[in-house]
Protein backbone atom coordinates (compact mmCIF):
# COMPACT_ATOMS: atom_id res chain seq x y z
CA UNK A 1 0.00 0.00 0.00
CA UNK A 2 1.52 3.35 -0.97
CA UNK A 3 2.56 5.69 1.83
CA UNK A 4 0.32 8.63 2.63
CA UNK A 5 1.35 11.87 0.94
CA UNK A 6 4.11 13.55 2.88
CA UNK A 7 4.65 10.57 5.20
CA UNK A 8 8.17 9.94 3.96
CA UNK A 9 9.07 13.60 4.34
CA UNK A 10 7.65 13.71 7.84
CA UNK A 11 9.64 10.62 8.76
CA UNK A 12 12.87 12.15 7.47
CA UNK A 13 12.11 15.36 9.38
CA UNK A 14 11.54 13.47 12.64
CA UNK A 15 14.80 11.57 12.16
CA UNK A 16 16.84 14.71 11.52
CA UNK A 17 19.61 15.00 14.18
CA UNK A 18 18.68 18.58 15.13
CA UNK A 19 15.00 17.67 15.49
CA UNK A 20 15.85 14.65 17.63
CA UNK A 21 18.17 16.78 19.75
CA UNK A 22 15.41 19.35 20.30
CA UNK A 23 12.93 16.63 21.29
CA UNK A 24 15.43 15.09 23.70
CA UNK A 25 16.06 18.50 25.30
CA UNK A 26 12.35 18.71 26.07
CA UNK A 27 12.79 15.55 28.16
CA UNK A 28 15.75 16.91 30.12
CA UNK A 29 13.62 18.26 32.95
CA UNK A 30 10.96 15.61 33.28
CA UNK A 31 10.91 12.38 35.27
CA UNK A 32 13.11 9.73 33.69
CA UNK A 33 11.14 7.11 35.62
CA UNK A 34 8.20 7.37 33.21
CA UNK A 35 10.46 7.21 30.15
CA UNK A 36 11.92 3.85 31.17
CA UNK A 37 10.59 0.47 30.15
CA UNK A 38 8.17 -0.59 32.93
CA UNK A 39 10.24 -3.73 33.46
CA UNK A 40 13.25 -1.56 34.36
CA UNK A 41 11.58 0.79 36.85
CA UNK A 42 12.06 -1.28 40.00
CA UNK A 43 14.31 0.42 42.56
CA UNK A 44 13.57 -1.20 45.94
CA UNK A 45 14.51 0.74 49.08
CA UNK A 46 15.65 -1.47 51.95
CA UNK A 47 13.63 0.31 54.65
CA UNK A 48 10.46 0.15 52.55
CA UNK A 49 10.68 -3.10 50.59
CA UNK A 50 8.02 -5.60 51.59
CA UNK A 51 6.02 -3.08 53.61
CA UNK A 52 2.27 -2.91 53.05
CA UNK A 53 0.95 0.47 51.96
CA UNK A 54 -2.66 1.59 51.58
CA UNK A 55 -3.45 4.42 49.15
CA UNK A 56 -6.73 6.22 49.80
CA UNK A 57 -7.94 7.47 46.41
CA UNK A 58 -9.67 10.86 46.58
CA UNK A 59 -10.88 10.68 42.95
CA UNK A 60 -7.67 11.48 41.11
CA UNK A 61 -6.11 9.66 38.15
CA UNK A 62 -2.70 10.46 39.64
CA UNK A 63 -3.44 7.77 42.24
CA UNK A 64 -2.51 5.00 39.81
CA UNK A 65 0.83 6.70 39.15
CA UNK A 66 1.53 6.88 42.88
CA UNK A 67 0.82 3.16 43.03
CA UNK A 68 3.36 2.45 40.28
CA UNK A 69 6.03 4.44 42.10
CA UNK A 70 5.36 2.73 45.42
CA UNK A 71 5.50 -0.69 43.77
CA UNK A 72 8.83 0.26 42.18
CA UNK A 73 10.15 1.04 45.67
CA UNK A 74 9.30 -2.51 46.73
CA UNK A 75 6.09 -1.84 48.65
CA UNK A 76 2.98 -4.03 48.51
CA UNK A 77 0.28 -1.64 47.31
CA UNK A 78 -3.46 -1.64 48.01
CA UNK A 79 -5.72 1.11 46.61
CA UNK A 80 -9.14 1.96 48.01
CA UNK A 81 -11.49 4.80 47.13
CA UNK A 82 -12.36 7.13 49.97
CA UNK A 83 -16.04 6.19 49.65
CA UNK A 84 -15.61 2.41 49.79
CA UNK A 85 -14.95 0.30 52.89
CA UNK A 86 -11.31 0.12 53.98
CA UNK A 87 -9.29 -0.09 57.15
CA UNK A 88 -5.84 1.11 58.19
CA UNK A 89 -5.24 -2.13 60.08
CA UNK A 90 -3.04 -4.58 58.23
CA UNK A 91 -0.99 -1.84 56.56
CA UNK A 92 2.39 -0.48 57.58
CA UNK A 93 1.96 2.87 55.83
CA UNK A 94 -0.89 4.96 54.46
CA UNK A 95 -0.85 7.44 51.57
CA UNK A 96 -3.77 9.87 51.61
CA UNK A 97 -4.12 10.76 47.97
CA UNK A 98 -4.78 13.84 45.87
CA UNK A 99 -8.09 14.78 44.31
CA UNK A 100 -10.34 17.63 43.20
CA UNK A 101 -12.25 19.69 45.73
CA UNK A 102 -12.24 22.71 48.01
CA UNK A 103 -10.60 21.71 51.31
CA UNK A 104 -12.44 24.56 53.04
CA UNK A 105 -15.82 22.88 52.43
CA UNK A 106 -15.68 20.79 55.58
CA UNK A 107 -19.30 19.71 55.15
CA UNK A 108 -18.65 18.10 51.77
CA UNK A 109 -18.73 14.28 52.16
CA UNK A 110 -15.28 13.75 50.67
CA UNK A 111 -13.60 16.56 52.60
CA UNK A 112 -15.32 15.42 55.80
CA UNK A 113 -14.06 11.88 55.19
CA UNK A 114 -10.49 13.02 54.52
CA UNK A 115 -10.49 15.17 57.65
CA UNK A 116 -11.73 12.27 59.77
CA UNK A 117 -9.21 9.85 58.24
CA UNK A 118 -6.23 12.18 58.67
CA UNK A 119 -7.29 12.98 62.24
CA UNK A 120 -7.43 9.28 63.03
CA UNK A 121 -3.99 8.70 61.50
CA UNK A 122 -2.57 11.52 63.61
CA UNK A 123 -4.28 10.40 66.82
CA UNK A 124 -3.34 6.74 66.39
CA UNK A 125 0.23 7.66 65.40
CA UNK A 126 -0.06 5.67 62.18
CA UNK A 127 2.72 6.52 59.69
CA UNK A 128 1.33 8.33 56.65
CA UNK A 129 2.01 10.67 53.74
CA UNK A 130 -0.59 13.14 52.43
CA UNK A 131 -0.58 14.48 48.86
CA UNK A 132 -2.11 17.69 47.41
CA UNK A 133 -5.75 17.84 48.59
CA UNK A 134 -4.95 15.58 51.55
CA UNK A 135 -1.90 17.75 52.30
CA UNK A 136 -4.21 20.78 52.44
CA UNK A 137 -6.57 18.94 54.78
CA UNK A 138 -3.64 18.02 57.04
CA UNK A 139 -2.39 21.62 57.02
CA UNK A 140 -5.75 22.94 58.21
CA UNK A 141 -5.93 20.31 60.95
CA UNK A 142 -2.51 21.49 62.14
CA UNK A 143 -3.78 25.07 62.33
CA UNK A 144 -2.35 26.56 59.13
CA UNK A 145 -4.35 29.02 57.05
CA UNK A 146 -5.55 28.12 53.57
CA UNK A 147 -6.31 30.39 50.61
CA UNK A 148 -7.26 30.21 46.96
CA UNK A 149 -4.36 31.08 44.67
CA UNK A 150 -4.87 34.06 42.37
CA UNK A 151 -3.69 31.88 39.51
CA UNK A 152 -4.17 28.11 39.86
CA UNK A 153 -1.20 25.84 39.27
CA UNK A 154 -2.25 23.47 36.52
CA UNK A 155 0.77 21.48 35.47
CA UNK A 156 3.35 24.06 36.57
CA UNK A 157 6.96 23.00 37.13
CA UNK A 158 8.86 24.93 39.80
CA UNK A 159 12.19 24.61 41.55
CA UNK A 160 11.65 24.67 45.31
CA UNK A 161 13.71 24.40 48.48
CA UNK A 162 12.51 21.09 49.94
CA UNK A 163 13.96 20.97 53.44
CA UNK A 164 17.35 22.18 52.25
CA UNK A 165 17.49 20.39 48.89
CA UNK A 166 16.51 22.04 45.62
CA UNK A 167 14.00 19.96 43.68
CA UNK A 168 12.15 20.56 40.43
CA UNK A 169 8.55 19.49 41.03
CA UNK A 170 5.10 19.66 39.45
CA UNK A 171 2.18 21.57 40.99
CA UNK A 172 -1.54 21.16 40.24
CA UNK A 173 -3.36 23.17 42.90
CA UNK A 174 -5.98 25.87 43.23
CA UNK A 175 -5.57 26.25 47.00
CA UNK A 176 -2.45 26.57 49.13
CA UNK A 177 -1.66 26.48 52.83
CA UNK A 178 0.45 29.35 54.14
CA UNK A 179 2.93 29.66 56.98
CA UNK A 180 5.04 32.56 58.20
CA UNK A 181 7.63 30.22 59.72
CA UNK A 182 9.73 27.21 58.79
CA UNK A 183 8.56 25.34 61.88
CA UNK A 184 5.37 24.99 63.88
CA UNK A 185 4.71 23.29 67.18
CA UNK A 186 1.41 21.52 67.73
CA UNK A 187 0.33 20.70 71.30
CA UNK A 188 -0.64 17.14 70.36
CA UNK A 189 1.41 16.27 67.29
CA UNK A 190 4.78 17.81 68.11
CA UNK A 191 7.26 19.88 66.13
CA UNK A 192 6.59 20.06 62.40
CA UNK A 193 9.08 21.23 59.76
CA UNK A 194 7.64 23.45 57.04
CA UNK A 195 8.99 23.72 53.49
CA UNK A 196 7.61 26.97 52.07
CA UNK A 197 8.09 29.79 49.61
CA UNK A 198 10.01 32.45 51.53
CA UNK A 199 8.26 35.27 49.65
CA UNK A 200 4.63 34.13 49.63
CA UNK A 201 4.59 31.74 52.58
CA UNK A 202 2.95 29.05 50.43
CA UNK A 203 3.62 25.66 51.99
CA UNK A 204 5.28 23.09 49.74
CA UNK A 205 5.57 20.25 52.25
CA UNK A 206 5.35 19.29 55.92
CA UNK A 207 7.26 16.77 58.03
CA UNK A 208 6.28 15.78 61.55
CA UNK A 209 6.70 12.78 63.85
CA UNK A 210 5.46 9.84 61.77
CA UNK A 211 3.92 11.86 58.96
CA UNK A 212 4.78 13.95 55.91
CA UNK A 213 2.90 15.78 53.21
CA UNK A 214 3.49 17.50 49.88
CA UNK A 215 1.50 20.04 47.91
CA UNK A 216 3.23 19.06 44.68
CA UNK A 217 2.84 15.72 42.92
CA UNK A 218 5.93 13.52 43.25
CA UNK A 219 4.30 11.10 40.81
CA UNK A 220 3.97 13.74 38.07
CA UNK A 221 6.16 13.60 34.99
CA UNK A 222 7.02 17.23 35.89
CA UNK A 223 8.77 16.15 39.10
CA UNK A 224 12.25 15.22 37.92
CA UNK A 225 13.23 12.88 40.75
CA UNK A 226 9.78 12.03 42.03
CA UNK A 227 10.51 8.44 43.01
CA UNK A 228 13.47 9.52 45.13
CA UNK A 229 11.49 12.39 46.68
CA UNK A 230 8.64 10.02 47.55
CA UNK A 231 11.07 7.42 48.92
CA UNK A 232 12.76 10.04 51.11
CA UNK A 233 9.40 11.21 52.47
CA UNK A 234 8.33 7.65 53.28
CA UNK A 235 11.68 6.81 54.84
CA UNK A 236 11.53 9.94 56.99
CA UNK A 237 8.04 8.92 58.12
CA UNK A 238 9.23 5.43 59.07
CA UNK A 239 12.24 6.75 60.96
CA UNK A 240 10.33 9.45 62.83
CA UNK A 241 7.23 7.44 63.70
CA UNK A 242 6.82 7.61 67.51
CA UNK A 243 6.02 3.91 67.81
CA UNK A 244 7.78 2.69 64.69
CA UNK A 245 5.67 0.87 62.12
CA UNK A 246 2.47 -0.35 63.72
CA UNK A 247 1.79 -4.08 63.60
CA UNK A 248 -1.72 -3.56 62.13
Residue ranges of predicted features:
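Secondary-structure transition/capping residues
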Residues: 74, 148-149, 241-245
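RNA-binding accessory domains that recognize and position tRNA/RNA substrates
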Residues: 1-61, 185, 219-248
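Pocket-forming structural segment of enzyme catalytic cores
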Residues: 115-120, 124-131, 136-228, 232-236
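Short amphipathic alpha-helical segments, especially helix-boundary/capping motifs
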Residues: 40-44, 90-92, 134, 206-210
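Flexible gly/pro-rich beta->alpha loop and the following alpha-helix that scaffold active-site loops
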Residues: 52, 60-131, 136, 142, ...
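Residue-level detector of alpha-helical recognition elements and their boundaries
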Residues: 78, 109, 152-153, 248
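Short low-complexity stretches enriched in small and charged residues
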Residues: 47-60, 86, 127, 163-175
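Short, mixed-charge, low-aromatic patches
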Residues: 19-23, 70-72, 183-193
